[in-house]
Design a protein with these regions (language model features):
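N-terminal membrane-targeting segments
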Residues: 18-24
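Mature, soluble, non-transmembrane domains
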Residues: 54, 74-151
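Bacterial N-terminal signal peptides
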Residues: 9-17
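Bacterial N-terminal signal peptides that target proteins for export
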Residues: 1-8
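Residue-level marker of positions within ordered structural domains that often coincide
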Residues: 1, 13, 76
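N-terminal secretory signal peptides
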Residues: 24-86
């Protein structure tokens, strides 16, 4: 067998051993994010592209420090907390984060998230390229439920 044939045979063997090529794993699903105020009958629906990050931005009610929670929708119709950002070590510890740094990756899936609209500065939702106040759905103290509806 010539050196060129051996090289080709070795390359063919390596390709066969590697198996079929796989696509990158999905980093999120497309779908619709729904935020509802069940008591008032108001809701907000936001269409999201696959893997599109949406965020809830607020002042932590205990520590009065800024927090950003980043989420995506998964293929199972759940909301997945992907990251928490805060300059406050106390806020990060509240989330169970003990390492240094303001931003921390997470992987916490939830079927729904319940919020109370803050009595001070209301939370804001950044989704679909728009930022909206939770006050668009109710008053301070109202209960909001966030869910995913896969497409």
């Amino acid at each position: 067998m010539s050196p060129r044939s051996r090289t080709f045979a070795l390359l063919a063997l390596l390709v066969a051993m590697a198996g079929p090529a796989r696509a990158e794993p999905s980093r999120g699903a497309s779908g619709e994010l729904v935020v509802e105020n069940p008591e008032r009958g108001t809701s907000l629906r936001v269409r999201l592209r696959p893997g599109e990050v949406f965020s809830v931005v607020y002042q932590h009610s205990i520590y009065e420090q800024p927090v950003i929670e980043d989420f995506v929708l998964d293929e199972g119709g759940r909301i997945v907390l992907r990251a928490v950002t805060s300059p406050s070590a106390a806020v990060r510890e509240y989330f169970g984060i003990t390492s240094a740094g303001e931003r921390h990756a997470m992987a916490r899936p939830m079927s729904e998230i319940v919020f109370r609209i803050a009595t001070g500065t209301a939370q804001r939702l950044r989704a679909g390229g728009v930022e909206r106040s939770f006050l668009e759905l109710g008053e301070h103290g109202d209960r909001l439920v966030m869910r995913a509806h896969p497409s």
